[in-house]
Amino acid sequence: MDIKRTILIAALAVVSYVMVLKWNDDYGQAALPTQNTAASTVAPGLPDGVPAGNNGASADVPSANAESSPAELAPVALSKDLIRVKTDVLELAIDPVGGDIVQLNLPKYPRRQDHPNIPFQLFDNGGERVYLAQSGLTGTDGPDARASGRPLYAAEQKSYQLADGQEQLVVDLKFSDNGVNYIKRFSFKRGEYDLNVSYLIDNQSGQAWSGNMFAQLKRDASGDPSSSTATGTATYLGAALWTASEPYKKVSMKDIDKGSLKENVSGGWVAWLQHYFVTAWIPAKSDNNVVQTRKDSQGNYIIGYTGPVISVPAGGKVETSALLYAGPKIQSKLKELSPGLELTVDYGFLWFIAQPIFWLLQHIHSLLGNWGWSIIVLTMLIKGLFFPLSAASYRSMARMRAVAPKLAALKERFGDDRQKMSQAMMELYKKEKINPLGGCLPILVQMPVFLALYWVLLESVEMRQAPWILWITDLSIKDPFFILPIIMGATMFIQQRLNPTPPDPMQAKVMKMMPIIFTFFFLWFPAGLVLYWVVNNCLSISQQWYITRRIEAATKKAAA
């Protein structure tokens, strides 16, 4: 029966690694960042201008008609004077041509831990990378659908900043055409990564105005600059959207390469996902929108929506708006903004285990203030939850160890007669009340928890650059000196010594190799995950040693 346990452990080791690779196949993005050395070490700033370009190109503005192709627009030069906006959590630049957000930094999230003053950059349109949030008015009279190109807005200032004590900042961009006055308004709130983008349409033209609001996210095929996992596992980089039938529908770059998507959706959201961060347009819940994905002539990927027809009578005024979220994947914040948006924190098929783990881990952290110690306490709680099951398993293993001399005698007695040997072993197990597969139960129980915790550490932005103690400065990446994996291998070896020795020499050799194999796997796993396994092993060793000693003492007493 020991061979079954050996095979099970080996299979679980292989399965766990294959599952990680499978996650990479299903959710990963093979493309790598196309940044030069200078770009990786210099802070991505917000320059005053961007190169002249083809911002009025057809690929930028969707058609208001769901059945037609994107509108063909004449090119127009970009403005060289970007409008810069700074709040306590956002630093961004708006191009007055079209009013697109072409650059956005997150000052609360450093790009690298060793350079805390260099903020992580989400949106960028400076040449190295294309990633921006666009919105406008298209349709019959929409200024973004003009043959002459997208509108050139004017602002009262070139820079805006949320002052100390100020809770809200409003930035107005103005444009007039054919008797219609437009205000594109950006509203920011202190401490918030979502902003309201609204259009105030004042029709003084003497005739009715008709158009549609659109909003979209445009990105090139470059890799994910926020992905720093060292396991060889890439997190999902691609688009996603909400529908009534599918609250979280992913649309990868490969899907967009195969063909455009168009769906009629009431409310919902469209988003672009990357490791730790998400950008999303959230229209009004009551609006019936046409959601679309496509690829433009420059090879950029676009996901967006076009809203319902807006009618403004002569002399009338109308306001329409949408929310834009650009920031970290904070589940509580995302859930407040729109149903299903919190699902962009993708824990995979074990989400039903991962979500309670994260909830508990978050509450522990609120008390301790350190994610490393929180993982240790979480491990102790999980171990306590499965204590009865583990205790039963260790008692079975201890009894196996106690009857080892009897098993050796049976082997000597029956020699190569495996049938009689197996029958005699089963009778002995039954007599001694031993479950030969009992030692496998803790591994079977721990593996789903282990994998769920892996995805919690991989996906939760709260773990990004979270230190523990001493050399562990980031629990979301590998131990830089491989100390924790080596300690884990040592604890596995000690735990193995407490187990009964397999009667077959080949099985014994395989079992001795397991700590080495697991140590090799764990060298590149997140330090937080290895910490969990080390603490779990230490608790298991203590529990197993105590139970084994008690049973051995009872056996000696009975024999006396």
From Swiss-Prot:
Signal peptide positions (record): none
Superkingdom to which the source organism belongs: Bacteria
Keyword Transmembrane included in the entry's annotation: yes
Membrane-spanning intervals of the chain: 1-21, 341-361, 367-387, 437-457, 468-488, 515-535
Region described as Disordered: spans on this chain: 42-66
Primary subcellular site in the record, as a coarse category: membrane
InterPro entries: Membr_insert_YidC, Membr_insert_YidC_N, YidC/ALB3/OXA1/COX18, YidC/Oxa/ALB_C, YidC_ALB_C, YidC_periplasmic_sf
GO biological process, one term: protein insertion into membrane
Localisation per UniProt entry: Cell inner membrane
This protein's UniProt keywords: Cell inner membrane, Cell membrane, Chaperone, Membrane, Protein transport, Transmembrane, Transmembrane helix, Transport
Gene3D superfamilies (alphabetical): 2.70.98.90
GO molecular function: membrane insertase activity
Transmembrane listed as a keyword: yes
GO cellular component, as recorded: plasma membrane
Stated family: Belongs to the OXA1/ALB3/YidC family. Type 1 subfamily.
Role according to the record: Required for the insertion and/or proper folding and/or complex formation of integral membrane proteins into the membrane. Involved in integration of membrane proteins that insert both dependently and independently of the Sec translocase complex, as well as at least some lipoproteins. Aids folding of multispanning membrane proteins.
Protein's name in the database: Membrane protein insertase YidC
Gene: yidC
